[in-house]
Amino acid sequence: MSTRNSRSELEKTAVQLFRKLGTRTVLFHQAAAQALGLFPTDLKSADILNEAGPMTAGELGKKTGLSTGSVTALVDRLEKAGYVAREKDPNDRRRVVIVPLTASKKHIKDLFRPLSESTMDLCREYTEEELELIFSFVGKAADIMEEELERLKQ
């Protein structure tokens, strides 16, 4: 096999593996949401809030691509389940921000702990240099996914 064919096959394999990982990730998050009594979009929105911190419903809508009405219903569900609270914006008392609650972070973290531990075990199979290369590649792949997400939203 020539280097060109080998390279082409490796690239195809990368695409196939990312598709496989993406599918497994979606299915895992659906099961995790169900275990928490949430819808998958609710769980991912809670994750966005835990990662980015407090934001308005409009900002959450932009990040998720959900309509205003859908975000309102989603925040209602998350608030009722104890994952978020609505608070007045300390910088503008006319605005309301959605704040992730610390207890909910722990609850979600506990659910994901086995996956995190398995991922750390996997990392131990590689050298620091290999991990840096893997992280660079995966980080760039995540950037591509973000760009494609924005393209689809337009």
Swiss-Prot record:
Residues 7-143 form the HTH marR-type domain. Residues 57-80 bind DNA. InterPro entries: ArsR-like_HTH (IPR011991), HTH_MarR-typ (IPR000835), MarR/SlyA-like (IPR039422), WH-like_DNA-bd_sf (IPR036388), WH_DNA-bd_sf (IPR036390). Keywords: DNA-binding, Transcription, Transcription regulation. GO terms for molecular function: DNA binding; DNA-binding transcription factor activity. One of its GO terms (biological process) is regulation of DNA-templated transcription. This is Uncharacterized HTH-type transcriptional regulator YcgE.
